[in-house]
Amino acid sequence: LPITAITGKSEFMKAFDDLWVSSTNNSEALSLAGTIAVINEMKEKNTIKSCWNQGTKLFEKWNQVVTSYNINAKLVGYPIRMKMECLDTNGNESIILKSLILQEMVKKGIFMSQGVSFLSYSHSSEDIEFTLNALDETCKTISSIENESEYKNFLEGEIPKTVWSMKIPPTKKN
């Protein structure tokens, strides 16, 4: 079961002294025990620092590789939550370049999201090196294409399209 905690500064938490907080699973101890075990594991193995270190290595070296091939496909965001931003020569987003990179990376055993990618404690230094080697091979393939207008000819499927988007109507001001 999920676990929730209501926390905060003591000055704000005092408000709960006069409140009755009810929860469906108040006496359910298994999730609490599991949470404690996970927190202890995270502390013992310093997983947060490890994720930031591995993510920083991937983030920085990825950007060095694509820059060395003059391919505008940089990782942006944070080393633990990054997104590949692909731009054409005019500085516009290039879904074709992103699709081509993702296609070639999958062929080399690396699956990446079109959106954000998260780094986890299970990603080893070997995984990072494997990813960077796959990227280097992918960049060699892409840099051999003479003109970016030809990228779509190398895609082995349709150009991805948005399948769902949420349109929020403007709110009226009173």
PLM segments and residue spans:
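Conserved N-terminal phosphate-binding loop of PLP-dependent enzymes in the Aspartate aminotransferase
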Residues: 1-174
